[in-house]
Amino acid sequence: MAMANLARRKGYAVVLSSRSSLCLTRWRGFASGSDENDVVVIGGGPGGYVAAIKAAQLGLKTTCIEKRGTLGGTCLNVGCIPSKALLHSSHMYHEAKHAFANHGVKFSSVEVALPAMMGQKDKAVSNLTQGIDGLFQKNKVTYVKGYGKLVSPSEISVDTTEGENTVVKGKHIIIATGSDVKSLPGVTIDEKKIVSSTGALALSEIPKKLVVIGAGYIGLEMGSVWGRIGSEVTVVEFASEIVPTMDADIRKQFQRSLEKQGMKFKLKTKVVGVDTSGDGVKLTVEPSAGGEQTIIEADVVLVSAGRTPFTSGLNLDKIGVETDKLGRILVNERFSTNVSGVYAIGDVIPGPMLAHKAEEDGVACVEYLTGKVGHVDYDKVPGVVYTNPEVASVGKTEEQVKETGVEYRVGKFPFLANSRAKAIDNAEGLVKIIAEKETDKILGVHIMAPNAGELIHEAAIALQYDASSEDIARVCHAHPTMSEAVKEAAMATYDKPHSHLKSWLLLSSLVFIFVQEFTMTWR
């Protein structure tokens, strides 16, 4: 960080990432008064619209091209935002039905009004897309609705939504076209019986039986939505575990929590056949390694096998932009492709396919173009599974740290010993911190809690500034708060929990967890 600060004072741009430790470049000026754009962004998702707005704010003549007709990309229109709206609505229903009585709130009946639930989701999406439109107008970003394809490193042919064709020119072109649903061989998505995440956000009725193919973030979130409001959910996963990138300790408790909620898992299982000829769907499955086949029946099947970069029709090969075998555009630490003047950010390049990562890419790319300071460190991008409880992480898992050979220490603290969690009767989960043994530098933090997605950012800041577990432990945290569990886990990492009382609570909680695990194993 000291070197980066020195570079800033000298007038250099700085890009920090896992791909390169430090990159410097002098400020570059731009001509004004020309009809040609300084920056043209293809794609109006989180990476694209943020890059466009940032470029305009820095004084660049900017145009953004978006084929969907509404800004926000997959995230805002058919991803992050609508799914979180449904997750919250379904959680409220589940709480009303199963938890309110414990708090003295009773009523005779509760039911799901699915049209109203969908209406709330659509309202949230509409308000936010209109908000981005307003930001474009405020910052004087030219918005072209249509499908853009490269005809040269400085020209984009656009088939507009009005049926016309126009050519947009730019000194610098940023490709931010995002990603699309990854298909499965032999499983055809019709968005009726067999749906993608897009279709799962718009079902007209609650399926009695829902099968989710894929136990990743999206599949588990959408399975949770429909499971909470009445669907019998079965998750089919080819791998031996859910969310393979998750820390093993957290994963174990997370799966147990989902199973307690009624979600069923068929791990090490692959789909080998699909029959949609009847009223529902019949899936033929077998062990991933081969073996006896069985049939799973469902009303709706959700295909959630990941996402793939969306680059088809961009004419990348025509202008010579290099991609890897997965279709991702290859860029350097400055987001430059091998073609001068052409850049790429977000899901179309290597790195986690996350909206917030794309936003950071967009800002850093534009800041580089104007000689300002930009940075993205892919090793410190937080990730969240927005189920209940939520699971959030930043940095390395314990398994990844082991692979490096670095000696480390682990501190854990369960929410069963957290005063606020007990007060609100929602004490499931824990905080786990991994720190280097010699320096106490935090290497990874993993949280399972009702609000893990909010709590994780204390850890994200700590990792960004190379903090130690003692640094977190010595910060005064308000009492009673869920965030105290982060402090206690930090104390457990470098020393011990704060007080004898909390040590006793911790011991009691660990005994309780052990009994739970033993009982479930015995059953």
UniProtKB/Swiss-Prot annotation:
Its EC number is 1.6.2.6. Residues 1-30 form a transit peptide. Disulfide bonds join 75-80. It is found in: Mitochondrion. GO terms for cellular component: mitochondrion; oxoglutarate dehydrogenase complex. The keyword Secreted does not apply. GO terms for molecular function: dihydrolipoyl dehydrogenase (NADH) activity; flavin adenine dinucleotide binding; leghemoglobin reductase [NAD(P)H] activity. It comes from the Eukaryota. FAD binds at residues 66-75, 84, 148, 177-179, 347, 353-356. PROSITE patterns: PYRIDINE_REDOX_1 (PS00076). The active site is at residue 479. NAD(+) binds at residues 214-221, 237, 271, 306. Pfam families: Pyr_redox_2, Pyr_redox_dim. Widely expressed. Expressed at higher level in leaf and nodules. GO terms for biological process: 2-oxoglutarate metabolic process; pyruvate metabolic process. Keywords: Disulfide bond, FAD, Flavoprotein, Mitochondrion, NAD, Oxidoreductase, Redox-active center, Transit peptide. Binds 1 FAD per subunit. The keyword Mitochondrion applies. It catalyses: 2 Fe(III)-[leghemoglobin] + NADH = 2 Fe(II)-[leghemoglobin] + NAD(+) + H(+); 2 Fe(III)-[leghemoglobin] + NADPH = 2 Fe(II)-[leghemoglobin] + NADP(+) + H(+). Its cofactor is FAD. Its main location: mitochondrion. Reduces ferric leghemoglobin (Lb) to ferrous Lb. Homodimer. Belongs to the class-I pyridine nucleotide-disulfide oxidoreductase family. This is Leghemoglobin reductase. It comes from Glycine max.
